[in-house]
Curated annotation (Swiss-Prot):
Higher taxonomy: Eukaryota, Metazoa, Ecdysozoa, Nematoda, Chromadorea
Pfam families named among the record's database cross-references: DUF2615 (PF11027)
Gene for this chain: smim-14
Organism, scientific name: Caenorhabditis elegans
InterPro entries registered for this protein in UniProt: Uncharacterised_CD034/YQF4
Protein name stated in the entry: Small integral membrane protein 14
Assigned GO CC terms: endoplasmic reticulum
Amino acid sequence: MSDPCECFFDHESAMQRLLAMLRNSQADCTDTGCDNDGLSREGGNTMMMWTLLWTFMAMALYVMRPNSMRSDRRTADDAAIEKPTGSSDDNTPPPPPPSAM
């Protein structure tokens, strides 16, 4: 089963598909050369549209990212909130470890 369509079509249908593909290729190409490069104009245009769409979506997501993902300079208040420092009193004992009970 080298042909995936072999499960659905018999040998005669496969030959008809092959002949149809050959006839279609003869309309595009002759013995001396081909009229087009093998890609239809719509195919190349569609690829360009998809590329532009993905680029636009990536730029929109980058611009609308939340503040937590931005690497802007943070103020001293923000740094104090994110990285707590020890208390100013050095004589306080550390908190007791959690009990196993």
